[in-house]
Amino acid sequence: MRNKFINLLGSICFCWGVVACTAEPPKEIRSGEIWPDNQGVHVNAHGGGVLYHDGTYYWYGENKSDSTSSAMVGIMCYSSKNLTDWNNEGAVLPVVLNDSTSDIVQGCVMERPKVIYNEKTKKFVMWFHLELKGKGYAAARSAVAVSDSPTGPFKYIRSERINPGVLPFDMNETQRAMLDTLDAEKYKEWWTPMWYEAIHKGLFVKRDLQGGQMARDMQLFVDEDGKAYHIYSSEDLSLIHI
């Protein structure tokens, strides 16, 4: 009996040792290392944002090449259950190849894509920073696309500057009256103390009021009450707007 017990104990220890030796250690997120997707290709999702929906993480980002910062492919999506293993879902908002009049024609700039889920419409809504092809960074537009699925395809809706003709609601009457005193011709030299003072008084808000405010680096946030916020750098990257 004693020998049988010893043999059984030895078998249990051996099996446990085999399991312990063959079990894969938990994966870690390692900053600065190449991060391959499920196809062994480096994840290509720059300036991205992550949406968590129904137990899955969706990572949206810019597809970038080594030779240009322009959009040659479009907005990519990767999905994961654990934030370490990522499946390539492809270009969920590809650039347009056969229409030179499109805002998102190949060669434009598509940056900082963020996606949220609209509970009312049951749509996935993407916002991103858009610069028109051949215009450098002068457009400074926000663009919107929607999809029925987190993995696309997303349908491009439109792009525009933010709130044309609308002043920030937190500007009081004194601040609004101050805008009439600001003459852009007096502040052609940037980064001076006088220029900074004029910026804080609303020099660029006044400059861009008619066409709408600039929107570049950006983020989306949905509060517990379902209200969504668009947070972005504006006024030539000098201030943050919400």
Q: Which residues make up each language-model segment?
A:
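Bacterial N-terminal signal peptides
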Residues: 9-17
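Bacterial Sec-dependent signal peptides at the C-terminal "C-region" and cleavage site
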Residues: 18-26
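Beta-strand initiation motifs
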Residues: 27-30, 84-88, 150-157
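Short consensus segments that form the blades of beta-propeller domains
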Residues: 39, 65-71, 103-106, 132-138, ...
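Hydrophobic core segments of beta-strands in well-ordered, beta-rich domains
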Residues: 46-70, 90, 111-137, 145, ...
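Blade-loop segments of beta-propeller domains
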Residues: 76, 83, 87-119, 130
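Asp-box/WD-like beta-propeller blade repeats and closely related beta-sheet repeat scaffolds
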Residues: 129-222
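Conserved small/polar residues in nucleotide/adenosyl-binding loops
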Residues: 240-242
